[in-house]
């Protein structure tokens, strides 16, 4: 009987090692697929990432300054700096969405310029003129934003910096604001941010397949995927979740979202707002607006809400 239990124990150990090995192999494949997946097709987003003809033309015609920084991993990141006509020490960094580039942020400039802000338009890595093959969902983007903030502060040591992001850019802004680097920001505007990219992927899988077995497989794979991510990046998936970042935020934040957003449900914005620890937080929902187009569908309302938030923030300083 003693030998039987010993053999049973050894069989159990062998099976556990085999399952773990297979799981890690599949988890590593899932990690690689996560980065190389055609997210434009999965999420139904048109890919305009590398079309920078408009921003280049505007740079030439308006004498805007093309700028660049080096990311910590050596990749070159590019942007456009637009100095306010006033002698201003405040700047907003405008951050575009997935498969877009800094051209997307042009409609957001006017209100900031009216309020006296310098403007820095940036291309996230893997977008526009910045190097990289694709987004890294926050693994490198937080450090990239630090490089841009340091560039601004080297240019003007008195500079105060705010972030305004749209969709993916909003989520990156929240990740930065919740990091150790982001505590000195003057404000964050998060327009149509997602809370958890893994959960968003799970929801899209359910919508596409409609089979609970796919979700079971997704959930079964999750711990191995997380282990593979930690092996490759030394970061946990939770570090890429704006839903966790807002729990560490101290800076003023304005959450914006469309009530008819079918990509990132409006409940996400409400959850981010509810869990945000900032002593000054606001939320505004644009009725009838789809994903990340509030500035088009509700332009005057968008500008009014933004201006009121920024002016209140300035008064509180």
State the predicted function of each range.
Residues 98-111:
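The serine-hydrolase catalytic nucleophile loop
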Residues 248-250, 255-257, 261:
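Short beta-strand/loop motif that positions the catalytic acidic residue
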Residues 289-299:
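Catalytic histidine-centered segment of alpha/beta-hydrolase-like enzymes
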Residues 4, 14-70:
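An N-terminal hydrophobic leader/cap segment in hydrolases
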Residues 135-156:
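Alpha/beta-hydrolase active-site loop
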Residues 111-131:
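Conserved alpha/beta-hydrolase
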Residues 178-235, 244-245:
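Hydrolase active-site cap/lid region
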Residues 260-264, 292-293:
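Acidic catalytic loop of the alpha/beta-hydrolase fold
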